[in-house]
Amino acid sequence: MMKFFRQQASQPAAKPGEKPAAPRRMGPPKFTPEQQAEIDKYKEEVKAWRLGLDLSKVEGARKLLSDAGISVHIVKMQPSGMGSDEEVDYAFKVAKAMGAKAVTDEINLETAKRVAPFAEKHGMYMAFHNHMQYAEEGFSCDPILAISPSIMLNFDAGHFFGSTGIHPNEMIKKYHDRIYSIHLKDKTGPTTGDQPNTNQVWGQGEMPLEDVLLLIKQEKWPIYCDIELEYDIKPWSDSVKEGDRKSVV
């Protein structure tokens, strides 16, 4: 299926001396009838697999992680892309079987309206993740949070800072009781030279990481903090070395 989406996203490179074309605005991709038929068939196959999944297999995966000292608090299932209510229900069943208390997806008002009843049904949270939305004029998470107490934020402090330049603690102080988890990464701000809003090695960017962590520690707020590795890794390193505890302390 990804081949179709890559074709839609591809953009001709600029010729020597030409100015690169402006990035395409992302919208619903257009497919030929044959491509759409193949996509629809694939979706039905995925739906059948999901609804027929034996949850004992998920519980087995949870045990493997638990035995390795890893606990799961949130699962990225993206119910916004699921075509049926049965699949949305499946998302919460799987997350619960993994030991998580929340499912996450991209922040969106319509998704919140659709998914909130399922989160309430399972006694879980729908925790919405952000990219650059807070930098968009007029955007607010308030209407989304107002839908249900089961709606929470999976607040990406790095993307928030990188796109707005605003200290993440302003958001955290205001919404700490509606923030389930926080994504932490180091980035440059939106006005930084020729590399604005760019991922950096932990501790080498402009994101006020220490401030965020100290605030949560001092206030004793029960918020999960997840460190994300999103920058390009040098050839002499790897993801394990970059994520080593000594590297981020």
Where are the language model's segments positioned?
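Histidine-acidic metal/acid-base catalytic patches
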Residues: R6-A22, P29-F31, E38, E44, ...
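Mature N-terminal segment immediately following signal peptide/propeptide cleavage
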Residues: M1
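Non-membrane alpha-helical structural segments and their capping/turn regions in soluble enzymes
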Residues: L51-L55, E59, D85-D89, L109, ...
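Active-site acidic/histidine proton-transfer and metal-coordination neighborhood
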Residues: A22, T32, Q36-E38, K43, ...
